[in-house]
Amino acid sequence: MGRIFLTGEKANSVLKRYPRANGLFEEIRQGNIERECKEEVCTFEEAREAFENNEKTKEFWNTYTKAQQGESNRGSDWFQFYLTFPLIFGLFIILLVIFLIWRCFLRNKTRRQTVTESHIPFPQHLNIITTPPPPDEVFDNSGLSPGFLEYVVGRSDSVSTRLSNCDPPPTYEEATGQMNLRRSETEPHLDPPPEYEDIINSNSASAIAMVPVATTIK
């Protein structure tokens, strides 16, 4: 028999319980089968080994199974909440980040548009329509009449439109207004040419009028 069964000391030396990671807490608060079965999932055999009595084991097992069923029912009610709440919270954070990024992008875009609009120069070929001045203010501070200013503006507009239409630039005569004078000078005379006798008479008269000059050589 001694070879088949071990004594108590030898059995405890072989079959012993190793301490857990919270061994210090277990030394302060000694555990029991009820607390261990509530904290962990235990079986009927483990409870019978702990109580070593069938009546106490059955009584404990009935209360333990009822408590486990109640806790499982309460846990199933909260399971959906524990599952959906993190998803809803994460989706809200993602939407908030997307909204902030879109807001910053829109603000930067509006700032760029305002800066570019402020730097765009005013086109020079556009005319500004203003009300006519009163008759007292016929001349401005520079001494130029409004008619002269309108003439200058109209000429600049014609030149700008000609340049925009890819026409060649105006000549010097067109720019200075001397085109009509040059045309009048180049036009042929309408008088008939002089006759041959008139040319001879004019040449003879000029020869008689000339006085000879005598030179002396010493």
Swiss-Prot record:
Segments on the Cytoplasmic face: 102-218
Keyword Lipoprotein: no
Keyword Transport: no
Family matches, as InterPro entries: Coagulation_fac-like_Gla_dom, GLA-like_dom_SF, GLA_domain, Peptidase_S1_coag_factors
Residue spans, topological domain Extracellular: 21-80
Matching Pfam families: Gla (PF00594)
Keyword terms: Disulfide bond, Membrane, Transmembrane, Transmembrane helix
Name the record gives this protein: Transmembrane gamma-carboxyglutamic acid protein 1
Species in which this protein is naturally found: Bos taurus
Lineage of the organism: Eukaryota, Metazoa, Chordata, Craniata, Vertebrata
Gene behind this protein: PRRG1
